[in-house]
């Protein structure tokens, strides 16, 4: 949510800022703006709507500057107006901010008493005025920023410049992601590396409470006590090619089709090892996982559904109790802590605020062992975890998660294998069988992708609908949940998912001739139960759209449409059945003309409550 980019260089930074903001669009936003130091004057342009509209306005201004900051805003405090858009300015101090300041009202009253007036409804303008206020005593911008952040309660990432200081700008981080890009004779700040990858791949990840000063010739970082510190320099593996569409219409479509490669990369270490060593999860994983007596998974959204799927695997295969909770609920309840249970957090970005706070809460309760599953190296959640396993999905730009979800499933399956071996529940021959299933997974996903033309025909039937129902059982109920979420996220069709056995306990009242019902029907031990549930739908006039394995022996009839997925893939079947529900959501949204990659009101990285 929201995005920051800043630059100081020996060249015009306006194109860098604009390009960076365009690459941050996927995070979700409703307005944007830049501020630059043009001579000795701070000049600013802001617009609601797309970055492209703001860029046109900036071009008309004919800015020329070697120092500037930019922002994409997701409205929290105050509506979607130009006055509320960033950057905010206080007498020559310009600032952009991600996050939420919880004590902004208290600070606002103090500032009003000092004679400051406010032009916006935002909490951000409070910070700009505070920095300006402290400049008088502190004497320089960095010291003023360091004094200011000590008065703030909440989460923030900040980039600040002043017309009085033409050779540097400053930044700060607490609870929201922020990194520094290190170039040659130029340096940058950004919410994520995609914003600056066109300029540099060398990055410094700021820690909680850090402040920093950026000049053309160098960077200085200070910790929460204002002591100078050295933070390691990393080489990002994000490439420009991964941020381009190539032959695809949308990033979501591209990322759906990248799943065979992403899965192959994610399982490569296990394939190379010819098994499932604990070292897949870090050098100390064997000692940590050997004594685990249970698993608790904390996640949000799509990652939560990955966790629900893993619960079936962990309990059935590894023989360990497993609970799965929505992170935003867990962090506010009086939870019971068992130090022998492993806390697993799942987050594509590694910066999801509720998941991060849930992890902190679990530790405070006495949980000793933590594992994070994440797609972004060196992000906050992995850094706060004892063990880490990175999915190798690559950059995911579309707001609706696709390849991150299936690679999370692949990692969770490998975790199940490791735990099962350590529990003595998986023999050598069973391990070899599971490894063979995993080896065939990318190919099976490719076969599922080949169903796209058939699914496109279904999408035309779905596009005029306003409601849809998804049904699944057992391992495939979370996939029904994921299918419903994808459809509602990007097509704006109201969709719900239920365990098929719950139909008669309420949802059946919704079924009529106008209600499409999507059924996940693999050829497993619950198939006959699913068929009975389907008969309940047909008896009420509901129209069935069935994703069935090739060996499920379904036939089409009036009101029953069937697409045959690859042969039943055993315990990895949920990964295969994810592909058609992703494609159905994508092509339905396409038929309805929605903004597939940037659906309304949603953000890719949710870094506020």
From Swiss-Prot:
Reaction catalysis annotation: D-fructose 6-phosphate + L-glutamine = D-glucosamine 6-phosphate + L-glutamate
Subunit-level organization: Homodimer.
HAMAP family in the record: GlmS
Functional note: Catalyzes the first step in hexosamine metabolism, converting fructose-6P into glucosamine-6P using glutamine as a nitrogen source.
Keywords: Aminotransferase, Cytoplasm, Glutamine amidotransferase, Repeat, Transferase
GO biological process: carbohydrate metabolic process; fructose 6-phosphate metabolic process; protein N-linked glycosylation; UDP-N-acetylglucosamine metabolic process
CDD domains in the cross-refs: GFAT (cd00714), SIS_GlmS_GlmD_1 (cd05008), SIS_GlmS_GlmD_2 (cd05009)
Gene Ontology CC terms: cytosol
Active site: 2 (nucleophile), 604 (for fru-6p isomerization activity)
The UniProt record lists the keyword rRNA-binding: no
Cellular localisation: Cytoplasm
Domain Glutamine amidotransferase type-2: 2-217
PROSITE patterns in UniProt: GATASE_TYPE_2 (PS51278), SIS (PS51464)
Protein name as catalogued: Glutamine--fructose-6-phosphate aminotransferase [isomerizing]
EC main group: transferase
Entry EC no(s): 2.6.1.16
